Amino acid sequence: DKAGNSIIRPDARYAEMTLHQMWEVSYLRIRNIRIQGDSAAISFHDPEAKIQFERPWPSPMYNCEHNSPFFISNALPLLDKPGEWYHDIRTHKLYYMPRKGERMDVAAPALETLVKFEGTREKMVDAVTFRNVNFEVTTWNRPSYKGHVPLQAGMFITEGYKLRPSIDRVNNHKLDNQDWLGRPAAAVELRYASRAVFDSCSFGHL
């Protein structure tokens, strides 16, 4: 497709940019790529585009050799090495280039949460025991549909902006970043619970 003198890449429809930023890594769904001469302008989907460009911190991280702190993935033309894959969201197909001698057995998770107990302050979940249970293979779908712009520890930002004026702190830099956070889905969730015991259990591929 063409728009003016620029070219819009159709194979960028489901591509993602992985952006390394100091203490966290963001995943931005690419909306389109406009190529003009030797330059390319990339735009992203919301809500991650709005969050990424409104928050002041953290910023992209360059090293002394000016290596690029980002890369693009999930585009079929980039599938060129064993171990790489491409997910076509429109056709619900997964393309994978296997490594030499690799078995093609697949465990494809469908659930975000395997076990959930939710009580109230007045009536708590009480005295629950899990023994010799393997909790394995869950997924987290939000980044596929809303991108992922975290603050740290995997907690995603729902809104973030620069404080004006900033808050002065003694012996420290000015505090000028304000974020609202959400927590990723968990394989096991307990709310308002007491005396919950996990005995000889394992957690993996979550």
Q: Which residue stretches match the model-derived regions?
A:
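Extracellular polysaccharide-degrading/modifying enzymes targeting complex plant/algal/animal polysaccharides
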Residues: D1-Y192, V197-G204
